[in-house]
C-alpha cells in the first residue's frame, strides 16, 4: 500500500503517526512536529504528524475539548507547509468529513464509531486514506467487516479500495481498564489492511481518575516493543513535552524527550522481526 508517498506493509520499516493528543496551538504543534521529524529522519521512519482539533469523547463535560475545527485545520495546514510533513486528524461527524479532507492527508475515525455505517461510508468516500480504529468492544477478526464496509463504499464511487488502515487501540477489560492483546495485531492482518498499533491509548485507563482518564505511561515502551515484535505496519503514539500539563491524555503520553531513544529500540526490533519473516504464516500448512 502507498501512503503519503511511502510504502506500507510488513516488508517495510514501520511508519509512525505521532503528535499531541489535542492541538494546543501553533507554537506547540510546530515544536513537537519538528522534534519528531528530527528523531524519525535519521532512523528512516516515515512520519505522519497528528493532532485533534476537538476531543468529542471526554470523561466530563468540563474537560477541555480543543481549539475547534477552523483553528485546528489552520494550525495543521501550517505544520504541513512549514515542516513538509503529512498530516492526520480525526473526524467525529459526517458533516465535517469534506472540510477536513480538503486540508489533511489522512483521516482517522474514533474507535467508538467503527460500527457506524453512514460514518464509515462518508470517510471512505472522502478520497483520503483512513486510519480506522477498532472499537474497545470489538473482536479483532470483526475488523474485517469494518474494512470490507469501507472498501465497498469506496468502490461505489470509483475510488481505490487500498486506502484503509486497521488500528488496534486496546480492548475493555473490566471497569476503567484496557488491555492490549498481542494476538489481535496478527488476527487483524486478515482484514487485508495494514495494521497499526495505537500504543498510547492501549495503556489508557478510561475515566480512571474520576472526571478524567488515567493511564500507565511507563507501560508504553513495554507494549511498543511487544507490538513491534509481533510485526505491524505502523505505530501510533501520542507525545507531549510536559505530559502533566497536556490538555488531554497526559497520563498515557510519551514524554517527548524520550521519543528518540524509544524509536531507536523499536527500529532494531522491527528490523529483526521483518528480516526473519513470520513463521506463523506456515503453521497452518
UniProtKB/Swiss-Prot annotation:
Signal peptide: none annotated. It is found in: Cytoplasm. One of its GO terms (cellular component) is cytoplasm. The keyword Cytoplasm applies. It comes from the Bacteria. Keywords: Cytoplasm, Lipopolysaccharide biosynthesis, Transferase. Pfam families: DAHP_synth_1. It catalyses: D-arabinose 5-phosphate + phosphoenolpyruvate + H2O = 3-deoxy-alpha-D-manno-2-octulosonate-8-phosphate + phosphate. GO terms for molecular function: 3-deoxy-8-phosphooctulonate synthase activity. Its EC number is 2.5.1.55. Disulfide bonds: none annotated. Pathway: Carbohydrate biosynthesis; 3-deoxy-D-manno-octulosonate biosynthesis; 3-deoxy-D-manno-octulosonate from D-ribulose 5-phosphate: step 2/3; Bacterial outer membrane biogenesis; lipopolysaccharide biosynthesis. Its main location: cytoplasm. GO terms for biological process: keto-3-deoxy-D-manno-octulosonic acid biosynthetic process. Belongs to the KdsA family. NCBIfam families: KDO8P_synth, PRK05198.1. HAMAP family: KDO8P_synth. This is 2-dehydro-3-deoxyphosphooctonate aldolase. It comes from Acidovorax ebreus (strain TPSY). The gene is kdsA.
Amino acid at each position: 500500500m502507498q501512503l503519503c508517498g511511502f510504502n506500507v506493509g510488513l516488508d517495510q520499516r514501520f511508519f509512525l503517526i505521532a503528535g499531541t493528543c489535542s492541538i494546543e496551538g501553533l507554537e506547540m504543534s510546530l515544536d513537537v512536529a519538528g522534534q519528531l521529524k528530527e528523531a524519525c529522519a535519521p532512523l528512516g521512519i516515515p512520519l505522519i504528524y497528528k493532532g485533534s482539533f476537538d476531543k468529542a469523547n471526554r470523561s466530563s463535560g468540563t474537560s477541555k475539548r480543543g481549539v475547534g475545527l477552523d483553528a485546528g485545520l489552520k494550525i495543521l495546514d501550517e505544520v504541513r507547509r512549514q515542516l513538509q510533513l503529512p498530516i492526520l486528524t480525526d473526524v467525529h461527524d459526517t458533516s465535517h468529513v469534506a472540510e477536513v479532507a480538503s486540508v489533511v492527508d489522512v483521516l482517522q475515525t474514533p474507535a467508538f464509531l467503527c460500527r457506524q455505517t453512514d460514518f464509515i461510508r462518508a470517510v471512505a468516500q472522502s478520497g483520503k486514506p483512513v486510519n480506522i480504529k477498532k472499537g474497545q468492544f470489538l473482536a479483532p477478526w470483526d475488523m474485517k467487516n469494518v474494512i470490507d464496509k469501507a472498501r465497498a463504499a469506496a468502490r461505489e464511487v470509483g475510488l481505490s479500495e487500498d486506502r484503509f488502515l486497521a488500528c488496534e487501540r486496546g480492548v475493555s477489560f473490566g471497569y476503567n481498564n484496557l488491555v492490549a492483546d498481542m494476538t489481535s495485531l496478527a488476527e487483524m492482518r486478515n482484514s487485508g489492511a495494514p495494521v497499526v498499533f495505537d500504543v498510547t491509548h492501549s495503556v489508557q485507563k478510561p475515566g480512571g481518575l474520576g472526571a478524567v482518564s488515567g493511564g500507565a505511561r511507563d507501560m508504553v515502551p513495554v507494549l511498543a516493543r511487544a507490538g513491534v515484535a509481533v510485526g505491524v505496519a505502523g505505530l501510533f503514539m501520542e507525545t507531549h513535552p510536559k505530559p502533566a500539563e497536556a490538555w488531554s491524555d497526559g497520563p498515557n503520553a510519551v514524554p517527548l524527550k524520550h521519543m528518540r531513544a524509544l524509536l531507536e529500540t523499536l527500529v532494531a526490533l522491527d528490523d529483526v522481526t521483518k528480516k526473519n519473516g513470520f513463521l506463523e504464516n506456515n503453521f497452518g500448512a
